Regions:
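Terminal targeting signals and extreme-terminal segments of soluble enzymes
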Residues: 1-81
Length: 81
């Protein structure tokens, strides 16, 4: 595991939301991060589809970590805008 991947994985594991939705960090490369989440009842809306808030939160998380992967060590990203 690279230092970059270790830094991002450590941050990922500290996020309670990601544990709650059962998200996993699949891959980390400079400028690209892949996150998977199983579809389950806990992330559904009233029609049985995955709630859009969960989708946008996972997208924001992946984009934030992809940006963080390009920054110097010790730099953090709060959100992707």
């Amino acid at each position: 595991m690279t230092d970059l991947e270790s830094r991002i994985r450590d941050s990922f594991e500290k996020q309670g939301f990601l544990r709650t939705v059962r998200a996993t960090l699949v891959s980390v490369e400079a400028g690209a991060v892949e996150i998977h989440m199983p579809i389950h009842e806990g992330v559904s809306q009233q029609h049985g589809f995955v709630h859009a808030g969960v989708v946008s939160a996972l997208g924001d998380t992946a984009a934030g970590y992809a940006a963080m992967s390009l920054l110097p060590d010790g730099a953090e990203v709060l959100t992707a805008e």
